[in-house]
Each structure stands twice: as structure tokens, then as C-alpha cells.
Amino acid sequence: MAMDEGLELPETVLARLAAEVDACERRYARMQKLTLELLAFYGSRGLHPVLLKGLDSASLYEIPSLRESGDIDLYFSENELFAAIPKEAVHNADNSWSYVFRGVEVELHDHILDIERPSARREAQRIASESPSGSVEGLPAEVRGLSPRMRILLLSSHLLKHCLGRGIGLRQVCDYALARAACDYDRRIFEADCRALGLSRWVAVLDNLCVRHLGLDGNFSASYAERERRRLDSLSDRLLRRLLDEGNFGRESGRGKGALNTFMAFLSNMGFSLKLAPGEAFYTVLSLAKGRLKKPSPSGKTQNRSL
């Protein structure tokens, strides 16, 4: 793709961009290698991990290797989770487990959607049971990923979790916008799922942001009365300011990342959170508080200690 005449970038900038692209592609290749190795390891021990985000989200892009790599997130059924946890794993406030595998952080989850409200969690379990896992484009057939329906719900709920707390990054918003545009799913079912999970207002704000600022087709945003549309515009503008101030744009790296700092971040954002998803905001803070007080141990359970 060529820039318009007069807008060409200086050679020094082009050289830096070329170096960054090369580094990004190398990180992606390493992430792919480690992810496949880890999935094969678990599979050889009779476990059935499902890939969340990461390479699954990268498959949505025209050039997957140009999506910046992050952590490796895997879902295990409740019956398999403790068998998958290595002895060095740390329990997190959100009830996931994390450890480092060859320099890359791995997170293990016993639920797919980042939902805390009890009645909504039951709905999340129902939706997950109706949406079997599938393959991931560009990866071996034995790699299990999410169905289009679950992928979009995961990305939207995960974005909400970050928005309620430390802030969201542009990469995650782009993942969501691409999933909305590219995945084959029934939009009426998606809207019903959002109502059942208490995500309708949040998804409306997120869609508004993606349509107005990221080029998502306006057809993906429902029609609203003028007063409600202005309210959504205002909330998405506020969300955009947070997007530019936090996440990939620098401020997050300066914060403490312990459980107490995470808890305080959620409390400090409560005013905005209550306008987006009040029930989820309340139960997320409650869950984090409980998670700090009680940290379950996998001792006594069958563990995988060979990683």
C-alpha cells in the first residue's frame, strides 16, 4: 500500500517500522511454536485445552503475524483444570492460574467468559454448552478454538473486564471489531446472549466506538432514538479517552500489578463502570475482594508437574 504523494514517511521512520514489523513477525512465530508445543503437551496427557484469544484472535487478521502477541490463554473443563496446573503456578484474584513457560506467561481458566454476576454466570454456562469448540484457521486441525458465537462474547466480556479495571488496549478493541465483522454468527442470538449476560449496554457503547472510530460497518450497531444515541456517543467518547490514555498507550505499565492494585483500580473506575454494566461491575469488585481473602491451593489434586 502506497502513501499519497506528499505524505510519504521519512526513510528513518520507514526503517524503524520495518524493524518493528520484523520483530512482530518473529514474536508471532515464537508464540505459535510455543502454543502448539504446549497444546501438544497437554494433549499427550489426555487433557483437552481450548485456545482463548491469542492465535485464535490473530487468525481474524489479514496478516495474522502482524498482530502483537501477548499471553497464552487456555480453557480447561473444571474436571481437567487441576491436572493442568504445574506446581509453580500462581493463583490470581480472578480465579485463573498463571505460570511462565519458556519466557511467555500462560493463564489457565475454568470458564470461558469473564462474567461474575451469579445469574449471568449460569447463563454463560448454558451458552457455552450450546456452542461446541471448533478449529482455528491457519492452525493444525487438532487445535481447538471457540465457536464464532463464543469468540465474540469472550472478546466483549474480556474488554469489559479491562475497562472496569486497568483500562483497555487498542489491540483488544480491534480483535473485537474484526470478530464482529468477520465471524459467521446469528446477530439476533448474539443480542439475546448479551441481554442474558447483562452486557447489552456495554456492547452498544463498544459498537458505537468501533463504528465511529475504527471503521466498523454501521449495520453492526443497532438503531437507537436520538436521546439514547447521544448518550452512547458520550459514553464511547469517554471510552476512547481511556483507550488513548491506558492499555497499549503507556500508562498501564506504570501501575502496580499486584492483587491490591488491581482491586483499587476497579474501585477507582466504579462510577464509569456502573454506567456500562452495573451488575457486572458490582460483582467483579466483590469477586476480587473475595479472591484476595481466599486463595485455593491445588494441593491434594492431580497436578501436572512436568512442565
Model-derived features: positions:
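Conserved NTP-donor binding/palm subdomain of two-metal-ion nucleotidyltransferases/polymerases, i.e.
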Residues: 1-70, 75-307
